[in-house]
Regions:
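C-terminal edge and immediately downstream basic/flexible tail or linker adjoining helix-turn-helix-like DNA-binding
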Residues: 2-3, 11, 138, 156-178
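Acidic, proline/glycine-rich intrinsically disordered inter-domain spacer in sigma factors
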Residues: 2-3, 10, 14, 80, ...
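Sigma70-family region 2
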Residues: 5, 43-60, 79-81
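Structural recognition of an alpha-helix C-terminal capping motif at a helix-to-coil junction
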Residues: 39-46, 59-71
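A short pre-motif secondary-structure segment
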Residues: 122-126
């Protein structure tokens, strides 16, 4: 493998420094777990670094990285081992606290987390990342119609599960919390 040009390494380092916080937000919203989002971002940035010399237009590196984040997250969620989680409490002894109230944001987040990977990615990209249907379709490597269908089905499921009396929380700039 040929040595990387210093200009490629510098351009990549500048890209990571400037855009990694935004990319982390996308990774967190897509995968739903802070530590897994860090791993997802790291793995995605490694893939971008490997492909960096082949990128025709470095200005499209962010879109390319988001696409890698989404496809890698979908791939991870398909693995059987992804759904295995360590817990501090055994399921048979865990008793939910009846006095604990669930906030609207927690309910919304929970329902978003229950969606299948492609539906979740479509909702996150459309509404959390505020991307157009065309941009979302491009990142997900599908048609605009597929994005519309995935979003429609996902929102229908969420409405059904949350009920008619659910009032969504006001938009908040601090969506990502560790």
């Amino acid at each position: 493998m040929a040595a990387r040009r210093q200009s490629d390494v510098s351009a990549y380092a500048e890209f990571v420094a400037a855009r990694s916080a935004s990319m982390f937000r996308t990774a967190y919203l897509v995968i739903g777990d802070y530590q897994l989002a860090e791993d997802l971002l790291q793995e995605s940035l490694v893939k971008v670094y490997v492909a960096w010399p082949r990128l025709q237009d470095v200005a499209k590196a962010e879109a390319y990285t988001r696409r890698i984040i989404v496809t890698t997250a979908i791939s991870w969620r398909r693995r059987r081992s992804f759904h295995e989680r360590a817990t501090d409490e055994l399921p048979e002894t865990a008793v939910p606290d009846p006095t604990e109230r669930v906030t609207g944001r927690d309910k919304l987040w929970s329902e978003l987390h229950r969606l299948p990977p492609r539906q979740r990615a479509a909702v996150v990209l459309r509404f959390c990342e505020d991307m157009s249907e065309a941009q979302t379709a491009d990142l997900m490597d599908c048609s605009v119609g597929t994005v519309k269908r995935q979003v429609s089905i996902a929102l229908g499921k969420m409405r059904e599960r949350l009920g008619a009396d659910f009032v969504p929380p006001a938009p908040d700039a601090s969506v990502v919390t560790p």
